[in-house]
């Protein structure tokens, strides 16, 4: 069954099937789709969206429950298995259990030890305790006369006492020794006499004394300025009509504006609504 077409006459197409499908023709009858229905089918098809798969385990859709998956493997070989293990050649100690070693105590019998010969040690009669002085009593001094000691030849490598050059103790030259008093003799100083010329006497301004504010409480300081400027004469002062307050827009969006309405009639009553409702 075909669909309606915008053309006055529906005609069959002789183009291949793949081209008719791409052009939007119906492959069963070969009729072109109508204009109204074709505009409704311009959207993307189901194959355009790449949704995650719901089959398998890898990249499975997390919003869907996973279906059971099965794997097909080949049939196992029926050939006899070749045993390559060493077999029961391991020796397991029967005394070792999973709780530890379980066995009665065992003892070993050894041969007689070889007897050593008697040691040559002094007997009880070899000691003479009576010859020993009492331990807790004081003894008389005892001396021994020996041969004369051999004298060593004098050592010539040691310097003589006059070979040292000691620093003098005059002045403060050795810091570990107290220095002796030192004096210096200079020439006679001229007597202090006042100058004959008064111009040679220094004045108060010639002494470089520091500022007293540096080591005493700071004194008050004052500054002398010039005479203040006289005010302008009265004739130069602007009058009230010079200012235009209505044009000031510094502190507001626009200048204030006022409207003058008509005078209300004295006979007009006040509009009061019904208060009983």
UniProtKB/Swiss-Prot annotation:
Keyword Repeat recorded = yes
Q: Does the keyword Transport apply?
A: no
Spans of the STPGR repeats are: 122-148, 202-227, 238-263
Q: Which organism is it from?
A: Mus musculus
**GO CC annotations?**
cytoplasmic microtubule
The ranges of region (Disordered) come to 181-277
Q: What is this protein called?
A: Protein CIMAP1D
Q: Which UniProt keywords apply?
A: Repeat
Protein family? Belongs to the CIMAP family.
InterPro entries cross-referenced by the UniProt entry: CIMAP, SHIPPO-rpt
């Amino acid at each position: 069954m075909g669909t309606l077409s915008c053309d006055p006459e529906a005609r069959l197409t002789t183009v291949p099937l793949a081209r008719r499908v791409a052009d939007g023709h119906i492959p069963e009858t070969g009729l072109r789709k109508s204009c109204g229905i074709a505009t409704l089918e311009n959207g993307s098809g189901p194959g355009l969206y790449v949704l995650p798969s719901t089959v398998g385990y890898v990249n499975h859709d997390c919003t869907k429950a996973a279906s059971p998956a099965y794997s097909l493997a080949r049939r196992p070989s029926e050939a006899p298995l070749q045993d390559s293990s060493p077999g029961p050649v391991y020796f397991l100690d029967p005394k070792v259990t999973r709780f530890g070693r379980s066995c009665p105590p065992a003892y070993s019998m050894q041969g007689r030890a070889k007897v050593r010969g008697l040691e040559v040690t002094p007997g009880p009669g070899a000691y003479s305790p009576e010859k020993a002085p009492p331990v807790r009593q004081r003894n008389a001094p005892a001396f021994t006369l020996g041969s004369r000691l051999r004298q060593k030849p004098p050592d010539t490598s040691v310097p003589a006492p006059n070979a040292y050059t000691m620093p003098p103790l005059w002045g403060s030259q050795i810091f570990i020794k107290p220095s002796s008093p030192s004096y210096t003799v200079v020439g006679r100083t001229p007597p202090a006499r006042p100058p004959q010329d008064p111009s040679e006497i220094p004045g108060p301004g010639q002494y470089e004394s520091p500022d007293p504010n540096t080591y005493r409480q700071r004194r008050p300081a004052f500054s002398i300025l010039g005479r203040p400027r006289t005010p302008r004469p009265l004739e130069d002062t602007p009058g009230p009509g010079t200012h235009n307050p209505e044009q000031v827009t510094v502190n507001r969006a626009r200048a204030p504006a006022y409207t003058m309405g008509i005078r209300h009639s004295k006979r007009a009553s006040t509009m009061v609504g019904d208060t009983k409702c």
